[in-house]
């Protein structure tokens, strides 16, 4: 069909997987209820029964992507393998499900409107009046139905029911259910049931009102996940089910847990898969939840603790280092130790901050604020023999510190922070311009030098890691650094871009220009994080 066919059905979308089943996750009452984790948890249950799962996130906000959004407002920016800056929920999906997502799996309202307006300018609509329905709604549906070779597509709709920006997204998924058939779509709604200490009551009215607002948009929820500090009683589930037009068994207690990897187990105990299977007419299969049970057992075990100091500047927002803290947790599982994190403010850093830590990690970041503290942290780790891991900017500050204090280049710096310095870190060619979309983004290959710590860590001579940066170490100084004891142990295949530096004579001092946290798994960890935590355990104070 042509783009100006006014109310075309998504069935006609070229390449759409009409055999897939779709689960839409929406939220109400308040934001930050954990829709992303709920989506990942439902997907994990499906995978445990042998079904393949893909995941997508739709954010109604008007930014084209999260790339230039402040970590203080939005948390971390997650980078996909194909170089797209996405919402952090994609990290949950990839970690829980072990899938590789792409730029078409994180879609914002701004991107939708950008697409529609550009299509209008190109003349794709042949002079038609461009409207929210059908043009914007059709574009949303095209992203929902983008080809995937999977049994299920789990789509999270960001925000809450009632948000102005989100209304067109709710309208689009309502239409989509009609287009592909209601039995091929399931609507799961997250709500909140607050507990009032004064009266000792769990209040269900906010949930009832949220479901009613969803109904105003033409969507009947098929299952509710009610965030609550305790399990709902049978009477409470029956009451919610009656007012929300569903069986009581479809009302799930979204209880608070001390670790998100317990959520699939909590859902499994409440027969969430059975509800999904009944809705879609699937056979009721037994699931294998062994890998999540293993994590639960690890959490309960009495194990030694390794203390890692993270020297950063975005600690005011818990989600700013979400993938990083997850990767350290994963490494703890692999090393059979508990990892305790100490948040160290780079802006007020003092060497005494590291006196009680077993390892120092300096993560990525942008801008000059806090850089001096990060350089001082690298100096502390280098001179005291404390295991050090640097990520992105964490590699750059390690290079700057070494240049200043070992090579004697007193004004060594990055041109990002001082245009008049002696640059040991410089901007990459072709990466100037607007802040958005001009970084070196996504997965790039890296060749590792044999007989180095990096080679020992990875066990191979070629790796692929995800990047998000525009500054690099000046490779023309490689010999000068190597002669003094800091070597480049990983570089781009053409040899031009340093990717890993290390100190061979240090207990553990390894830094990468990439972001290994984006490829860490709760079931296998990541080689660099695993090695770092192992070194911290070995050097434990």
Give the location of each predicted region:
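Cysteine-nucleophile active-site neighborhood
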Residues: 36, 40-44, 48, 356-445, ...
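Active-site proximal loops enriched in glycine and acidic residues that flank catalytic Cys/His/Asp
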Residues: 27, 57, 228, 255, ...
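Short, Lys/Arg-enriched N-terminal segments with co-localized hydrophobic residues
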Residues: 5-18
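C-terminal and late-domain segments of enzyme folds
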Residues: 450-541
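Extended hydrophobic-aromatic, low-complexity segments
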Residues: 317-321, 333-337, 351-353, 369-373, ...
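Flexible phosphate-sensing "switch/lid" loops adjacent to ATP/NTP-binding sites
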Residues: 17-341, 347-359, 366-367, 373-380, ...
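A generic structural signal for well-ordered coil/turn residues at beta-strand boundaries
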Residues: 220, 247, 304, 356, ...
């Amino acid at each position: 069909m042509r783009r100006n066919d006014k109310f075309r059905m998504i069935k006609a979308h070229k390449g759409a997987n009409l055999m897939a089943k779709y689960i839409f996750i929406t939220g109400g009452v308040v934001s930050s209820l954990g829709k992303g984790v709920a989506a990942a948890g439902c997907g994990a249950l499906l995978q445990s029964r042998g079904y393949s799962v893909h995941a997508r996130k739709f954010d109604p906000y008007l930014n084209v992507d999260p790339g230039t959004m402040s970590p203080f407002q939005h948390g971390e920016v997650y980078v996909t393998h194909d170089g797209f800056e996405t919402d952090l929920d994609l990290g949950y999906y990839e970690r829980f499900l072990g899938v590789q997502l792409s730029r078409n799996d994180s879609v914002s309202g701004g991107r939708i409107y950008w697409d529609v307006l550009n299509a209008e300018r190109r003349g794709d609509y042949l002079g038609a009046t461009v409207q929210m329905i059908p043009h914007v709604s059709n574009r949303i549906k095209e992203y929902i139905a983008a080809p995937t070779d999977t049994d299920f597509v789990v789509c999270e709709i960001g925000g809450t029911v009632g948000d102005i920006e989100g209304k067109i997204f709710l309208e689009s998924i309502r239409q989509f259910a009609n287009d592909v058939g209601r039995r091929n779509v399931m609507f799961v709604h997250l709500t909140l049931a607050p507990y009032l200490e004064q009266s000792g009551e769990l209040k269900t009215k906010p949930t009832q009102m949220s479901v009613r607002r969803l109904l105003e948009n033409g969507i009947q929820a098929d299952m509710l996940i009610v965030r609550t500090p305790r399990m709902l009683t049978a009477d409470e589930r029956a009451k919610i089910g009656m007012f929300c037009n569903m069986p009581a068994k479809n009302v799930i207690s979204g209880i608070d847990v001390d670790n998100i990897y317990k959520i699939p187990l909590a859902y499994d105990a409440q027969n969430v898969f059975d509800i999904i299977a009944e809705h879609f007419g699937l056979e009721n299969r037994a699931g294998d939840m062994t890998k999540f049970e293993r994590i639960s057992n690890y959490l309960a075990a009495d194990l030694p603790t390794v203390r890692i100091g993270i020297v950063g500047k975005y600690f005011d927002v818990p989600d700013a280092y979400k993938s990083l803290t997850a990767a350290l947790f994963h490494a703890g599982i692999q090393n059979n130790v508990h990892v305790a994190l100490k948040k160290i403010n780079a802006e007020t850093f003092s060497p005494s901050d590291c006196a009680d830590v077993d390892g120092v990690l300096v993560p990525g970041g942008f801008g000059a604020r806090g850089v001096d503290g990060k350089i001082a942290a690298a100096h502390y780790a280098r001179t005291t023999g404390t295991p050090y891991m640097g990520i992105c900017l964490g590699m750059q500050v390690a290079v700057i510190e070494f240049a200043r204090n070992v090579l004697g280049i007193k004004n060594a710096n990055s041109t990002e922070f001082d245009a008049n310095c002696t640059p040991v870190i410089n901007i990459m060619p072709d990466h100037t311009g607007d802040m958005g979309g001009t970084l070196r983004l996504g997965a790039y290959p890296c060749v590792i030098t044999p007989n180095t710590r990096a080679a020992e860590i990875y066990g191979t001579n070629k790796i692929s890691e995800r990047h998000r940066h525009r500054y690099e170490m000046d490779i023309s100084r490689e010999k000068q650094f190597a002669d003094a004891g800091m070597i480049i142990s990983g570089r781009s295949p053409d040899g031009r871009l340093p990717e890993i530096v290390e100190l061979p004579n240090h207990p553990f001092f390894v830094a990468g220009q990439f972001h290994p946290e984006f490829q860490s798994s709760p079931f296998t960890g990541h080689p660099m994080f695993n090695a770092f935590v192992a070194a911290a355990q070995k050097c434990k104070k």
